[in-house]
Amino acid sequence: IDEIIPISFRNHFYASTGRTRKYPLHAFLWALIIQRIFSIPTDQLLLTFLAYSKSLREFCGFTKVPDASKITRFKQDFLDDLQLVFDNLVDVTEPICQAIDSAKADMTIFDSSGIEAFVTENNPKYANRIIKQLKAYAKAQGFDKSYDPYKAAYGSMPSHASANPEIKQLYINGHFCYVFKFGIVTNGLGIIRHISFYNKNFMASHPDIVVEKKSDSPDEDKCVHDSKLLIPTLKDFFSKHPLINPKTFLGDAAFDTAQLYKSLLTGDTFGNDKHFSKAYIPLNARSGLENLDYSINEDGIPCCPHDPSLQMKYEGTSKLHSGVTRYKFVCPRMKWIYDKSTQKSHRHCFCDNPCTSSKCGRMVYIYPEKDLRAYPGTIRGTEKWDDTYKIRTVVERDINHIKDNLCLAGRRTQNEKTLHADLILAGITQLITVVLADKINRHEYIRSIKPLIA
């Protein structure tokens, strides 16, 4: 573990001023990492294990078990140093990820979630009481079935916890909660590459983010907020790790906005001519695609002018001499006919109601750079799209993993620094798993440390 601790962390911990440290730096780090490896839910239970296990104390480097306050103070006082440890591990694990699967390592996936704080508003009875009152009110007033008490409850609940205005209301996994919001960037292997904690410091460093008042739709609010956080989060990621240069972005429909496609796929958004080549983002159902000459389906594929339900066939991608990429689509009724006399094949359209006089049938050329939203460097609705987009779920599994298995959920505190440190420690634990799996050549366990230590 000494190899991953920056010298600045050591200098800060063993400062020349102040009292002499009774407990070594590596002992605190090992104890907190082991807590997450074995999914020990509370710091107090960790200290109990240390008190009754001499071998565990010796492994960590403790000669005496510290108080619970020492653990808390360590997290709060050395939060920035823990962030440095995490950032160092990201750089250490990048070559490992590239060696395992370079295609997936070149993917960037983003999602956001929240750490539920220990506040009154997170008691299930709090939301249930409001919903019950609204249902009774709707019944008394004779409202019809279009009235949604859950949306009404969302609108009537406060936007932040009374104990701390930084603990914001959020709608996660089908329930209302009050959380410290964070964002996670992973690669296609599901290995965490970046963590952003959306507190006052983050907002101050990105003044271009405008926080709007909440609407009546919790899902819509989360989508709008996530789309505003994406580019600032990725800019922070690439500025910390300039040698990491992924080419493919995967995200959900919350990021389906014309401006985001332009930022992701063109220009100097993340550095000098540094941007993604492809963006796998499904179209938002609320806003489709339009074209005057022919209809376009929900995947951005042109359809027959006479039959919108009949999509044209994708025939390939080509590059012009100018370097411009174009996609070619042909009539779905077209077939290749072999001529024995010339020993060549030619196209022939067998449509009963042709939309063109050409014997080959209608052909459509799409230039992606003219409409990045419709054609973000790839074609929706194809087998390749479906296979690639499935990978996006690794970020959701990662979030569930760090919450359930790496001791992020159920923390009985509302202190921002403590919960932020817990989040970073969860990321550190996962990256140490990658290093350990690589050392013993068991890459199948890069996201599962328990089988490695069993």
Give residue ranges: language-model regions:
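DNA-recognition alpha helix
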Residues: 43-60, 91-94
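An internal, acidic/charged active-site-proximal segment
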Residues: 219-220, 226-339
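Short amphipathic alpha-helical "interface-anchor" segments enriched in bulky aromatics
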Residues: 50-51, 114, 293-330, 368-416
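Polybasic low-complexity intrinsically disordered regions
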Residues: 73, 77-249, 253, 258-266, ...
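Major-groove recognition helix of helix-turn-helix-like DNA-binding domains
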Residues: 60-79
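Long, low-complexity, polar/charged, intrinsically disordered or flexibly structured peripheral segments
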Residues: 163, 327-381
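Basic, amphipathic alpha-helical segments enriched in Lys/Arg and hydrophobic/aromatic residues
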Residues: 387-454
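Basic, short loop/linker segments at the boundary and entry of helix-turn-helix/winged-helix-like folds
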Residues: 1-34, 38
